[in-house]
Structures are given as C-alpha cells and as structure tokens.
Amino acid sequence: MVELGRWGCAAFVAPWLAAAAQAEAPRAVVQNTPDMTFSGSARIPACVVSAVVDGDPAKGASLAAVRASAACSIPWHWHTANERLVMVTGNAQVQMKDGKAQQLSPGGFSLMPSKHVHRFTCTTKCMLYVLLDAPFDLHYVDAQGGEISAEQALKGVAKKPKKPK
C-alpha cells in the first residue's frame, strides 16, 4: 500500500472534486412508466420510442426509457458517448462488431464504450433504460465500417413495424 500523506491524498482526489463541481447538480426523479411521454425519431427505426427520464440528451449525460416492438432492430452504429443499457422487460440481442450476438433478458446489462460499433435487436417486445455520459448522437455504419446516412441504414430495416404501446 502506498502512503500518500495529507498533500498526496489531496493531489490524488483534486481532479475528481473539480469534475464533480463542474457537473450539473443531480435532481430527484421518481417516475412510473405510464407517466412518461414516449416519442420516436426519424433517425431511429419506427418500432422504437423513447422518453427522456433525466438530463438533456442534446447537451450532455442523460437517461432514457426505451420501448421497442418484437423483431425491432437498430442496425450497426456507434455513439460518441459511452452507452449503458439495462433490460427491464422482454428479451434482446446485442452484438458488437466482430463478436457473437449476446442475449439480454430482464435485469441484463450491456456497456458499449465510446465509438464501439454494435447493433441491437429486441427479440420480443421490450423496455430498457439507456444511460449516456455525453450528448446523444448516432452514427450508422455499413458492413465495411464506413459511416452511412440514417436513410441508407434504415432501408434494410422492416418497413414501419407496428409501434410499441
């Protein structure tokens, strides 16, 4: 064990204290799913809707509740933020580029580091929470890893599956 002493300890902790001071003060949130307002986005398949629970995805870290219908898939993509997701209901598959698809069931967790290419499919109707540590962005990629438009990426997705309720 390394002895830091009073000043060594202060030097060790100072960067975290500075970051915490700059972060937005947390607020209390207690919310049930029926009270959330879900909506879709042109950049995401029509079978996915989300509701911001905390934060502002346009400006920084955020938490969103996400619902999707069975067989709903978000094609290969990446985010600038680190993405954490927790399954609440239903089952899904998460596949990292060059990896095998992994099954997620209620209570399951996945972490996709910044710019890590992945795809996500709800194999049954599902709900999950997604936590991002930076503003939300979505970069779709083709089979070779080159960035493509949302329109190109979503052409291969089933046409307007029934929206989840």
Please annotate each region the language model reported.
Residues V48, G60-L63, T80-N82, K115, ...:
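Extracytoplasmic
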Residues M1-F12:
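Bacterial N-terminal signal peptides that target proteins for export
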